[in-house]
Amino acid sequence: MEKFVYLTLLLLGALLPVADAQTNSGAALTNRAERLEWFRDQGFGLFIHWNVDSQIGTVISHSMVGASDDYLRRYVNDLPKTFNPRKFHPEDWAALAKLAGIKYVVFTAKHHAGFCMWDTATTDFNIMRTPFKRDITAEIIAAFREQGIAPGLYHSPDDFWWLWKNGMTLQRQTPEVQPRANPGLMAHDQAQVRELLTKYGPIDMIFFDGQAEGLREVAWKTQPNIIVTRGAIQTPEQTVPGIPLEGAWESNLTMGKAWGYQPTLESYKTGAQCISLLVETRAKGGNLLLNVGPKPDGELPIEQEERLREIALWMFANQECIYAVRPWVITNEKDTWFTKAKVTNTLYVIIKDKTNWFDGEWKEFVLKSVRATAQTEASVLGQNDKVFEYRPDLHPKTTVKQAADGLHIRAMHTQRYRETRQWPNPIVVKLTHVEPALTPPLVETTRARWDAAAKTAACEGDLKTLGDSASVEVGFETRDITGMDWNERTSAWMPGKLTPRTSTGAFTLSLDGLQSGKTYEVRGVVKHPLITLYGKELTLKVP
């Protein structure tokens, strides 16, 4: 009877595929400003990519596109029969996430394959039709809630199972396979979103990995306080933007190369690299959504656990510089990064360039963008600035001194985190009652086009201000994005020639060496004596 009711609703939905999008479609159907502000304060989330195909160690879902009929049949019919994660203990995941300073979780309730990790009436291709027969989504939400971690869900509008079941060729980024142009798929997806947002209580956020029109409206109507991340705010994938983006945004990145579990041919970022990504993202005003991919038996790979525990130690001492912070007047001075408390003039100076800082060793550095006041106080996060173990003769008080060349900071790391008495991860100095000491420049990327006659890219920018410098250098950078998903950016930026400027205004430069048939992103660059800043990214196709 349940399936009959669902099929009836599906047929009705096919006649009115965007009914929810057209009902009460006023200003209320959007992310609420106060909820986005809350989201920005959280700063650090855990992404969990898990699917039935983790059993064979393939890229999550995508192996279905271009697959043979036999492969698809066995994927849909056989893989669920052997999916039995008997070592699945979400309480352990949640406890580890809590230690690591995670504030919210986003779980892949349904990835592109269409396999549903919850007890759903919308398809037989779901977790209840496996030997496991437990609602994994429900258990994850409950376990993370118990730790005070806000629950979020990922839902893919693309659904390879639905396309296969309806005799359609599996494809990406073509209109006929998208819900917006496919009433039956839209109704199927809308029914799933309604289920997810009515079965499990309040859900703080939902991530639509594809065309969100017609689905985000269902989410906002069902739970008005929900935050739609991808589908409503910027969510760069596998990259941190070169500039702070406007408003709330979220970078989502993997620990290794893959989103799902990879038993072989995987290489991981170090714990230090993961911490650096968190620092850079927060310095630019965004959230970091760091991914794990559980094994088919339900355990986290040991490499992922190790990195979360390294992050946990760093966050145990330094979490104050991550939560409820906003960007400083500039994001960084070389390898020293900044976050500023949202409601006070407290600045966190996150020092990445003093690698392997030995305990008990004084370090001195100068900041150009910060000015002290009479009320300024300095300390190193995590330590009391009074005691160094076994050395009662030392007085490791952090000090600051304002001079003509900048703010001088003298600090000692005194906490013993490792047996070697070396600490490879950032040290954070907290400065209270400080002011900006510079005005940064501003560049805009205005146009990028292919000049067929000259066989080169003609790029145009606008230097809006030099800041407080008499001269700067301007230019452009490019990166190859051919064949990438619009959210995915994994290739490195390639610098172009810089030219000096002593005045504001438009500038045009040519970029040579771009390959025929490729698609590139282009961004303007301005190099100040203290910092390099960027304009927004534009797309350029080379014929």
Please give the residue ranges for each predicted region.
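Sec/Tat signal peptide C-region and signal peptidase I cleavage site
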Residues: 17-21
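Positively charged n-region of N-terminal signal peptides that target proteins for export
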Residues: 1-4, 97
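Mature catalytic domains of secreted/periplasmic carbohydrate-active enzymes
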Residues: 22-440, 530
